[in-house]
C-alpha cells in the first residue's frame, strides 16, 4: 500500500512525518490516520508537527497500515512478543503477532533475546505485520557479544540500531536517559533497576566508569532515524519496579534527561514518544502523567507555570507556541505489588487512570508478569484487560464517538439480542462461551433471560410502555397540584 507513497520521497535526507508536517504537507499516512480516527487531516498534521502525536511508519515497512499515538486520538495498546533463549521460534512469534492483532493490539514490540536468528525472527514479524513494530536494540547488541556487556562499544549499539531501521522497525526503545550520575540514586530502592535495557546500560557504565554511549551518541541515532522515519521511544531505564520506588529521585532525574533528549530530537524533526512507569500507587498516577507532560515539552511547561492537565491547557500551549508534550507510553502502571498471577488486573487499573489523565499508549501486562513467559491465553487476557482500560479512558476523556459502541451493546442487551451483544463485545468468543456454558441451545439466543436471573426474575423484561408513562406523568402532575393547593 505504501510503496508508491514512499517512492515520492526518494532522495530526501529527512523522511520523517514530523519533517513533512512542519512543512505544511499532509502525507498519505496522515490522511490514512485521519480516516481511521475520524479526525480532520489538518489536525493530524498539526499534532505531528507539534510533537504531540507520532505516526510510527518506517519507510521500509511497506505493508504497514498507518496509525497514530497521541493525546488527540484514541488511547492505544501495545502488546509485547518475542523469543527467549529457552523458548519460541519464528513460526511461534508470527503466531503471537497474529493473535495480538486479533485481540486488538495497536502496535507490537518484538523483545526477542534468543530462540534463533534474531534478524530472521524480526524480518518475519515485520513482513507479517500491518501494525507498527517496535524493538529494543540493546538486546541484540548484547547477543552479538555473547552476553559480555563490557565488550560492547558505541559502534556496536549504532550498528544494531541501523540494522533494525533498515529492516523496517517503526519505533525503537532507546535507553539514552540513564546517566552515570543517576546510578547512586537507586541505592535506597527495594527493587533497584528493573528495566532490562536499563540494566544493560548500567552494567556497562559501572564497568567502564564512562557515560552512557546512547546518550553521548544520541545525535548519531537521530541521523539514522531521519533516514528511515523511525520514531524514538525513549526508554525509562529507571522506572520503579515496585510501588515503594515510585516517583523517587532516580526516576525523576532520568525523566528530566528524557525531556532534554525529546527537545534535541525535535530540533532535527524526528518523532518521539516517552516511556513511563511501571509500578505507581493510585494517588501518584496523576502526578506522573503531569510531570512527563511538563518535562517533555518545548519549552518545559513548568518554566511557563502552565498546568498541562488544566481544561484550557491546549489553548494556553498554542498561545505560547509550545511543542509537545510528547506522547506518553506507560507500562501499566501496577497499583499494587501483591497479586502475582493477576497483574493484568493490578496494572489495568493504573492504565485506565493513566489513560484518563492523558497517556497516549498503554503497554499491556499479562497474568504471567513477574512469573514467566506468557502463552497465547495470557496474551489474550492481557490485551483484553488493556483494551478495556484504553476504552474506559477514551470514554472518560469524552472522545468523539467513544461511547457509541457501549450504547449499541446496551440497546442489544435490553432487547435480548444475544448475538448482537457477542458481536459488539471486545472478546466475542469469550462472551459467547460464558453464555453458552449454561444455556448452549440455539433457542436461548433469542430468550429474554440468561442463567443468572432465569425466565421469571430478569428486570429487563419490564418494558415500560410509553403511553403508560404519559398517563403516570399526568397523574403525578395532578398529585403535585393537589399538594400545592393544600
From Swiss-Prot:
Cysteine disulfide partners in this protein: none
A single GO CC term for this protein reads: cytosol
Please give the function described in this protein's UniProt entry: Catalyzes the synthesis of the hydroxymethylpyrimidine phosphate (HMP-P) moiety of thiamine from aminoimidazole ribotide (AIR) in a radical S-adenosyl-L-methionine (SAM)-dependent reaction.
> In the record's cofactor note, how is the cofactor described as bound?
Binds 1 [4Fe-4S] cluster per subunit. The cluster is coordinated with 3 cysteines and an exchangeable S-adenosyl-L-methionine.
Substrates-to-products reaction catalysed = 5-amino-1-(5-phospho-beta-D-ribosyl)imidazole + S-adenosyl-L-methionine = 4-amino-2-methyl-5-(phosphooxymethyl)pyrimidine + CO + 5'-deoxyadenosine + formate + L-methionine + 3 H(+)
Family statement drawn from the similarity comment of this UniProt entry: Belongs to the ThiC family.
Residues reported to bind substrate:
80, 109, 139, 175, 195-197, 236-239, 275, 329
- Record-listed E.C. numbers: 4.1.99.17
InterPro entries in alphabetical order: ThiC, ThiC/Bza_core_dom, ThiC/BzaA/B
Q: Which residues bind [4Fe-4S] cluster?
A: 450, 453, 458
Q: Which HAMAP family match?
A: ThiC
Which NCBIfam families does the record associate with it? PRK13352.1, thiC
Alphabetical GO biological process terms:
thiamine biosynthetic process; thiamine diphosphate biosynthetic process
Protein species of origin: Trichodesmium erythraeum (strain IMS101)
Protein's recorded name: Phosphomethylpyrimidine synthase
Which cofactor(s) are needed, names only? [4Fe-4S] cluster
Any one Gene Ontology MF annotation carried by this entry is: zinc ion binding
Amino acid at each position: 500500500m505504501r510503496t508508491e507513497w514512499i517512492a515520492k520521497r526518494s532522495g530526501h535526507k529527512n523522511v520523517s512525518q514530523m519533517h513533512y508536517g512542519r512543512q505544511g504537507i499532509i502525507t498519505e499516512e496522515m490522511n490514512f490516520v485521519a480516516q481511521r480516527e475520524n479526525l480532520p487531516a489538518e489536525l493530524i498534521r498539526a499534532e505531528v508537527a507539534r510533537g504531540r502525536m507520532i505516526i510510527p511508519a518506517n519507510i521500509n515497512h511497506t505493508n504497514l497500515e498507518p496509525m497514530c499515538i497521541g493525546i488527540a486520538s484514541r488511547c492505544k495498546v501495545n502488546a509485547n512478543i518475542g523469543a527467549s533463549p529457552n523458548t519460541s521460534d519464528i513460526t511461534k512469534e508470527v503466531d503471537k503477532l497474529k493473535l495480538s492483532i486479533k485481540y486488538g493490539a495497536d502496535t507490537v514490540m518484538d523483545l526477542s533475546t534468543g530462540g534463533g536468528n534474531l534478524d530472521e525472527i524480526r524480518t518475519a514479524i515485520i513482513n507479517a505485520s500491518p501494525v507498527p513494530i517496535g524493538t529494543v536494540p540493546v538486546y541484540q547488541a548484547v547477543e552479538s557479544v555473547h552476553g559480555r556487556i563490557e565488550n560492547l562499544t558505541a559502534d556496536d549499539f549504532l550498528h544494531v540500531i541501523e540494522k533494525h531501521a533498515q529492516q523496517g522497525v517503526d519505533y525503537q526503545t532507546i535507553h539514552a536517559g540513564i546517566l552515570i550520575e543517576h546510578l547512586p540514586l537507586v541505592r535506597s530502592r527495594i527493587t533497584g533497576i528493573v528495566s532490562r535495557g536499563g540494566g544493560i546500560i548500567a552494567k556497562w557504565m559501572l564497568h567502564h566508569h564512562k557515560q552512557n554511549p546512547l546518550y553521548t551518541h544520541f545525535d548519531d541515532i537521530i541521523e539514522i532515524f531521519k533516514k528511515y522515519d523511525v520514531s524514538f521511544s525513549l526508554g525509562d531505564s529507571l522506572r520503579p519496579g515496585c510501588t515503594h520506588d515510585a516517583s523517587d529521585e532516580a526516576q525523576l532525574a532520568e525523566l528530566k534527561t528524557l525531556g532534554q533528549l525529546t527537545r534535541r530530537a525535535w530540533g532535527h524533526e524526528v518523532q518521539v514518544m516517552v516511556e513511563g512507569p511501571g509500578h505507581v500507587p493510585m494517588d501518584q498516577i496523576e502526578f506522573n502523567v503531569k510531570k512527563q507532560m511538563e518535562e517533555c515539552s518545548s519549552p518545559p511547561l513548568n518554566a511557563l507555570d502552565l498546568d498541562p492537565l488544566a481544561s484550557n491547557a491546549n489553548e494556553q500551549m498554542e498561545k505560547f507556541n509550545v511543542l509537545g508534550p510528547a506522547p506518553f507510553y506507560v507500562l501499566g502502571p501496577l497499583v499494587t505489588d501483591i497479586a502475582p498471577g493477576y497483574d493484568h488486573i493490578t496494572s489495568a487499573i493504573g492504565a485506565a487512570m493513566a489513560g484518563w489523565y492523558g497517556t497516549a499508549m498503554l503497554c499491556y501486562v499479562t497474568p504471567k508478569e513477574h512469573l514467566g513467559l506468557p502463552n497465547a491465553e495470557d496474551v489474550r487476557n492481557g490485551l483484553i484487560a488493556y483494551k478495556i482500560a484504553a476504552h474506559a479512558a477514551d470514554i472518560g476523556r469524552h472522545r468523539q464517538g467513544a461511547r457509541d459502541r457501549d450504547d449499541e451493546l446496551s440497546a442489544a442487551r435490553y432487547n435480548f439480542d444475544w448475538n448482537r451483544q457477542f458481536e459488539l463485545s471486545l472478546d466475542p468468543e469469550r462472551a459467547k462461551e460464558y453464555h453458552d456454558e449454561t444455556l448452549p441451545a440455539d433457542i436461548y439466543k433469542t430468550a429474554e433471560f440468561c442463567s443468572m436471573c432465569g425466565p421469571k426474575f430478569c428486570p429487563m423484561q419490564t418494558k415500560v410502555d410509553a403511553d403508560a408513562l404519559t398517563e403516570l406523568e399526568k397523574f403525578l402532575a395532578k398529585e403535585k397540584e393537589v399538594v400545592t393547593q393544600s
